[in-house]
Amino acid sequence: MNFRYNQTPFGYQRRKTREVKVGDVKVGGNNPIVIQSMINSDTTDTQGSVKQILELERAGCEIVRLTVPSQADADNLPSIRQELKKAGSKVPLVADIHFTPSVAMKAVEYVEKVRINPGNFADKKKFAVRDYTDLKYNQELERISEVFSPLVLRCKELGVSMRIGTNHGSLSDRIMNRYGDTPQGMVESALEFIRIAESLGYYDIIVSMKASNPQVMVQAYRMLASRFNELKMDYPLHLGVTEAGDGNDGRIKSAIGIGSLLEDGLGDTIRVSLTEDPVLEVPVAKLLADKFNKKISNLNSVKGYSEFRNPFSYNRFYSSEIKIVQFEAGENHPVRVETILPFENSNSFLENVAKLYQYGKSLSIEPESILVDSPLPDQLKEISEAATALSIPVGILLSKNVSLNEKLQKELLSFPKIVFDPFLQFQDGEKMLSFLKERQNAGLFSEIHTSGDKLDSLRGLPDTLSEIGIKNVLFSLDSKEILYDYRKLGSILSRFEFPILLHGSFSNPEEALYNSAIGIGGLLIDGIGDLIRISTSKIKDIEEIFQLSYDLLQGTRLRLTKTEYISCPSCGRTLFDLQETTARIKSRTGHLKGVKIAVMGCIVNGPGEMADADFGYVGAGPGKVHLYRGKEIVLKNVPSEIADEKLVQLIKDNELWQDPSND
């Protein structure tokens, strides 16, 4: 299989795409990454729609999408256009179409772009299981072409662009039966429609591969880019994690998916989908776009590194086990979290640890490992004595200006793990190997931690360690280019079983949230990393960073430490106040660790886009809700006044309920 989907996974270069115009906005080519969003008002409500469009435009949104589910919505587009013209608005509009080709033919007259979903534009999903012969499959494609071609020809005639937007949760029965519920199915779904458009000489196409799980979404976009390379296609990519949710969780999921793809050079326009006021999506999108609009190509240090991943599926990078008393990491253990704490004296240190435990208790999480940040050598004895009061390992991060003399090496045998830079703290390589051997013989671990620019110098070390039987070593990096440098480290270590700790040091919690989600999150969804360690320079940030670390693991779906919510961003199809409903359901179910609950505004992105949710709460009509167990409807048309209680009872009936703690 050809794993190549970009220029290189080890450095930045944006993928070259064709330029597609959406009104006066240019997407792809050499243009900056374009920001877009979607209003959530009813499209038949002229004033409400215009108000939201203008608010988004003022916030910096460059393209605005609105849902057009019915003929009545399409008929109101001229009124919206007229009011926008009066207000002096020039923002291009996109009509979002599901199920209704006839409505698309009306809407195309009044918008700059049409978005169609290849999973439901010409198909009604019946969840039917059947074998398609090649003949039958081709007959289905001919049927689709008959339905789709009139819209393509009208777009071509009017100069209207189109997004062919696949959703993981709404693949057609035809695709599901041939390719399954997979990234490959998502890609082939879009390619079927692209080929029809190309056969009619139409190329003003933008493509998206959206999913609520960032891991699936990233794999699908990579596979699409790889197929584009094979087929000599150069269409721009619209990036987005659908149903990301709200708050930090929604921002983390979006940054993992969108940000890691932008690092790969993929993406020409982005939409951050939050279950919040649409205006609040724009600053998040701008933050992500600005980072990469300023980024320049850098392929200077990529030679000598080879692809060691399958970028289209998840496979955890195998490593040997780290076992310190009750602490276990690596091998098949969950990804662990290490917390950095300062040390002034025993009292303040133990007080900070106690605060961390107390905060962790409120999250139903206990701290797992602590690293003391750059203590003075004469503090080691006091730290060792303080650590005896704790049931979790306490390690030492050596200051860069500390030389590891023999006296200090002996004192460090009191600690289960130390972190050091081999290029700064040892002048003699043989002495370093002797030190590592001594620690291993004592059942202790050592973390080799150096800067990303020293990777070339690090290349031979794993071979040397393996030759002399040193196994109790893990590797980490201090780097501003977390994704690229850790991939290089992964390439170096791909023949070995040394564990990898993903380290990120940031100036403040907001920077930590976005950059750790992009860098560390982007690595985790590829199976790289056995532990994570995120820090800022301020002790006051420790609780926030502690929670961020576990939220990041939650966002990658590698470790669920709280209820997982899959909630759509709301649009004109939504049949209830999604923000209020989501908040209400969270207040009732937020303590159900590991349970996955989907909250969907309507059926379009309902059952399918719930992905692997255990339970679903989906709008069925005004004041009515369908409740799901998995993808199966178990209660239909439940009055919204009692739907929350019925959901709780459904969870109880399936023995996944636990009463909230009184703590």
Swiss-Prot record:
Reaction catalysis annotation: (2E)-4-hydroxy-3-methylbut-2-enyl diphosphate + oxidized [flavodoxin] + H2O + 2 H(+) = 2-C-methyl-D-erythritol 2,4-cyclic diphosphate + reduced [flavodoxin]
GO process annotations (BP): isopentenyl diphosphate biosynthetic process, methylerythritol 4-phosphate pathway; terpenoid biosynthetic process
Free-text comment on the cofactor: Binds 1 [4Fe-4S] cluster.
GO molecular function terms listed in the Swiss-Prot or TrEMBL record: 4 iron, 4 sulfur cluster binding; 4-hydroxy-3-methylbut-2-en-1-yl diphosphate synthase activity (ferredoxin); 4-hydroxy-3-methylbut-2-enyl-diphosphate synthase activity (flavodoxin); iron ion binding
Residues involved in [4Fe-4S] cluster binding: 568, 571, 602, 609
Annotated InterPro entries: Dihydropteroate_synth-like_sf (IPR011005), IspG_atypical (IPR017178), IspG_bac-typ (IPR004588), NO2/SO3_Rdtase_4Fe4S_sf (IPR045854)
HAMAP family named in the record: IspG
Protein name: 4-hydroxy-3-methylbut-2-en-1-yl diphosphate synthase (flavodoxin)
Organism encoding this protein: Leptospira interrogans serogroup Icterohaemorrhagiae serovar copenhageni (strain Fiocruz L1-130)
Gene for this chain: ispG
